[in-house]
């Protein structure tokens, strides 16, 4: 057998032969140690140093590609977390259902009953509060299909929920014109001179300024008095000018209070309405609340009787609703009582008493209906200061029996002129001088049934009975049992 070779001797022999070759090539021992270390590191023999340089170069390139600061890392993270921009046009505007939109009622959330920050769903017309997560509006948008477009009831801004981005689209302007009735000075002047017809969503035409009013909570007297006061030109101009569209763009569009006489008058004269009628619901609710706060002892039946009676409603309006400035400027005058030793008395309306109804029947066994001329009822009075608008009230048209508590109606018919009502001036009272009397033309007449017959700017007469509006002849105005009248002073012919 051949002898076994020792591994250590072989390694020493190889190292000595390698040292001899390095000396022959002019190297040194340090360089040889470095090369040997490279060999052990790379396990590749002679090509080690070249591959190490390539590896270092690759490491430098990788370090250059990586971000070097924390700010750059944060910016990159923010860019990836930023939500996408909202679309230029909302894809859900086709689901806006205008026939279901009704802004006449109290603006209160239908879920939480909150008044603040309320939105209207333009698909179903219901009111909801909030816009953020877990709010009634946000929940409604998630639960109902295609109910995504909402409009703020105070400023008219539209949003798409639950994505929560604002919608800027001109197609919603007609909705804002119903939510916020606005008028230019030219439109107000035009409304005072000519009749304007408009078309509702259902295709029916209605006359702007003579629209039906929905009767709410036994308030028939409210409807008739509102229709009558809407004929007073200066008062109407004051209400419409409050929502004037200014040329400088500084419009008061931030508040939308639909529980005032001003807002109700604006809706009556708005030519952009979706319907040919409107509702005084929120206005009547506010009146009831004010009365309950001022007179807690009053019962609901007492308030019902107040708003069912046109004359009682008129007194309440002139005292608490119509601005005092316009009451004094338009309706206040001074009356000379000729049958009380020429006593002078200021007035807002002239109270007139009808003759009592006869107690006995005529020869035909029928109750005779008495008649009296308005001129006869005005004989005991003379105007010392003539107001621009004269209100006449037949205060004993209804009377209450003190024993039975029953209300009876006086059926006396009053004959009156539609034009050129003459009322004597105080200078002619008790003297033989022939001074010119004051002349008045009729604007509105309210009968005992609560129907208001009003004169429009085109000279035609219209009978309004809650939601129903019919054109009538001037001769038909004097046929009913008149209760309250409004006249306008004109130049004597």
Question: What residues fall within each predicted segment?
Answer:
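UBL (ubiquitin/ubiquitin-like) substrate-recognition surfaces
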Residues: 2-493
């Amino acid at each position: 057998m051949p002898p076994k070779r020792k591994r250590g001797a072989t390694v020493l022999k190889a190292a000595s032969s390698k040292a001899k070759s390095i000396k022959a090539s002019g190297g040194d021992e340090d360089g040889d140690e470095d090369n040997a270390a490279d060999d052990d590191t790379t396990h590749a023999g002679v090509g080690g140093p070249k591959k190490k340089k390539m590896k270092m170069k690759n490491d430098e390139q990788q370090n250059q590609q990586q971000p070097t600061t924390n700010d750059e890392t944060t910016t990159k993270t923010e860019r990836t977390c930023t939500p996408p921009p909202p679309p230029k046009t909302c894809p859900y505007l086709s689901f806006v259902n205008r026939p279901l939109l009704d802004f006449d009622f109290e603006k209160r959330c239908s879920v939480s009953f909150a008044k603040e920050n309320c939105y209207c769903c333009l698909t179903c017309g219901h009111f909801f509060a909030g816009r953020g997560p877990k709010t009634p509006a946000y929940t409604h948008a998630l639960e109902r299909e295609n109910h995504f477009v909402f409009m703020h009831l105070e400023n008219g801004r539209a949003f798409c929920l639950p994505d929560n981005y604002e919608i800027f689209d001109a197609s919603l302007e007609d909705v804002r014109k119903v939510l916020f009735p606005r008028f230019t000075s030219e439109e107000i002047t035009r409304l005072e001179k000519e009749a304007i017809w408009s078309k509702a969503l259902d295709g029916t035409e209605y006359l702007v300024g003579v629209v039906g009013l929905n009767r709410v909570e036994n308030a028939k007297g409210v409807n008739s008095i509102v229709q009558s006061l809407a004929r007073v030109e200066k008062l109407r101009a004051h209400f419409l000018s409050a929502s004037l569209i200014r040329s400088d763009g500084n419009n008061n569009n931030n508040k939308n209070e639909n529980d005032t006489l001003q807002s109700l008058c604006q809706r009556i004269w708005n030519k952009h309405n979706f319907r040919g009628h409107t509702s005084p619901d929120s206005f009547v609710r506010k009146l009831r609340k004010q009365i309950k706060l001022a007179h807690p002892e009053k019962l609901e039946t007492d308030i019902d009787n107040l708003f069912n009676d046109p004359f009682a409603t008129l007194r309440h309006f002139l005292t608490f609703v119509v601005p005092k400035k316009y009451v004094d400027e338009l309706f206040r005058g001074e009356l000379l009582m000729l049958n009380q030793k020429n006593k002078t008395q200021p007035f807002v309306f002239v109270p007139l008493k009808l003759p009592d109804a006869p107690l006995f029947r005529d020869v035909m066994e029928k109750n005779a209906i008495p008649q009296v001329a308005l001129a006869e009822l005005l004989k005991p009075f003379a105007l010392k200061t003539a107001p621009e608008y004269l209100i006449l009230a037949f205060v004993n048209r209804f009377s209450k029996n003190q024993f039975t508590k029953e209300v009876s109606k006086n059926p006396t018919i009053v004959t009156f002129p539609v034009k050129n009502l003459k009322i004597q001036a105080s200078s002619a009272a008790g003297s033989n001088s022939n001074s010119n009397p004051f002349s008045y033309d009729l604007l509105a007449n309210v009968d005992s049934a609560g129907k208001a017959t009003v004169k429009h700017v085109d000279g035609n007469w219209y009978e309004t009975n809650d939601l129903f509006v019919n054109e009538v002849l001037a001769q038909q105005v004097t046929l009913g049992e008149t209760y309250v009248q409004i006249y306008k002073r004109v130049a004597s012919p």
